Every structure is written in C-alpha cells, then in structure tokens.
Amino acid sequence: MAYPAKRKKEIRKREVKGNIEAAKELAFRFLSYRSRSSEEVRQKLSQAGCAPPDIDGVIARLEELGYLNDYDYAFAMGRSWIEIKCWGPSRIRDALVKKGVAPETITAVLRELAMEHDFRRVACRALKSRFTRAEMLKLNGDKMRQRAIGHLLRRGFSWSIIADVIDSGDNIFG
C-alpha cells in the first residue's frame, strides 16, 4: 500500500496529535514498507506525538485487521536471518528482543524454527561463506580453529553445535 509523496507530507506531528485517523494512516504507511513488530509501530506513533490511548487503539485495530502480528513477524524475520545471514538461535533471540517482541513469542518462534532448520547445517553454511576450503582444512591449527569458533559464536550458535561442526571440519565442504 503506497502513499503519494504529497499525502506523506500532509501528516505532520501536529496533525497526528489527538487525531486517531491520522495515527492510523501513519501506522499503515509505516507498515507499507515492510512487516514490523507492534513495539516498533508503538515507538513510531509515540515519536509522531500520538497519545498512548490512541496508540493502543491503533495497534489493537491493526492486529484485529491482521496487519500486525508479532508471531508472524518474528517467524518471518527469524527464517530470513537463518537463510540469508546464517544466524543461530542466540543471535536471532537478541535481534527479536531489540525489535520489542515478547519473550514467550520469541521462545515459540525459535522452537518452530529449530524444527524447520538444522542449525548444524546453518553453522556449516556460515563457515563456508566466511572461510575458503583451504582455510577450513587448516582447522587443526589453533589460530584458524579460534577464528572459526569466534565466527560461529558471533553468529549466535551454541557451544554444542560449534563443537560438532568444528570437530567434523573435513565434512563441511563435502
């Protein structure tokens, strides 16, 4: 749902204040770019000067219409972070917390993502994208091994997955 540039400029901070319709329009415009968490929408409306009761009403209406669903948002973001960025569960959890997703929702999403994806394979893909085959064959050396471990830790993988992947280093490119 795209809004013409002229209409975008019409919604100013003073217009949004006390005007629930303008707040709804601002929220729709904010959601037109990409999916957002309810906390992101709440912050955006708050920055625009909306009153807290108006913000709650707009968010409730967006959820009712199906435009705002934290579970679907978290699942879609988690899936894309796994498939595109090769992130592990810890990194996904941290990113979703920063986006304002509820802890129960994050736990449920991570449980479902773990059933859908093998994080061991994701960790192998993360190493393949970071290191060349020749570098990976040198995993016996402490320096290269520490680099690989550090890379996977930064990507959010657990020690058990990292140990499993590093110990089977010869199979990573196979």
Feature locations, PLM:
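An alpha-helical, amphipathic repeat domain used for nucleic-acid recognition
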Residues: 1-174
